[in-house]
Amino acid sequence: MAATDVRPKITLACVECKERNYITKKNRRNNPDRLEMKKHCPRCNAHTAHRETR
């Protein structure tokens, strides 16, 4: 039942350094595409785009 969950847990990775920094949930019905947010990356020490990894 978890495989068809409407709100799965996803991991966000930094676009610059590829480090996986954040874990969040998303709604598959509202956001079927890959999620992208601007978050702080401690490795880059800057606000960078973080994209959903699969």
From Swiss-Prot:
Any one Pfam family match given in the protein's UniProt record, by short name: Ribosomal_L33
GO cellular component terms listed in the entry, alphabetical order: cytoplasm; ribonucleoprotein complex; ribosome
Superkingdom: Bacteria
Protein name, per record: Large ribosomal subunit protein bL33B
PANTHER family, alphabetized: 50S RIBOSOMAL PROTEIN L33, CHLOROPLASTIC, LARGE RIBOSOMAL SUBUNIT PROTEIN BL33C
A GO biological process held by the record: translation
InterPro entries the UniProt entry points to: Ribosomal_bL33, Ribosomal_bL33_CS, Ribosomal_bL33_sf, Ribosomal_zn-bd
Membrane-spanning ranges: none
Gene symbol of the encoding locus: rpmG2
Keyword Cell wall biogenesis/degradation: no
Keyword terms: Ribonucleoprotein, Ribosomal protein
Similarity comment: family membership: Belongs to the bacterial ribosomal protein bL33 family.
Organism of this sequence: Streptomyces coelicolor (strain ATCC BAA-471 / A3(2) / M145)
MF GO annotations: structural constituent of ribosome
Lineage, broadest ranks: Bacteria, Bacillati, Actinomycetota, Actinomycetes, Kitasatosporales
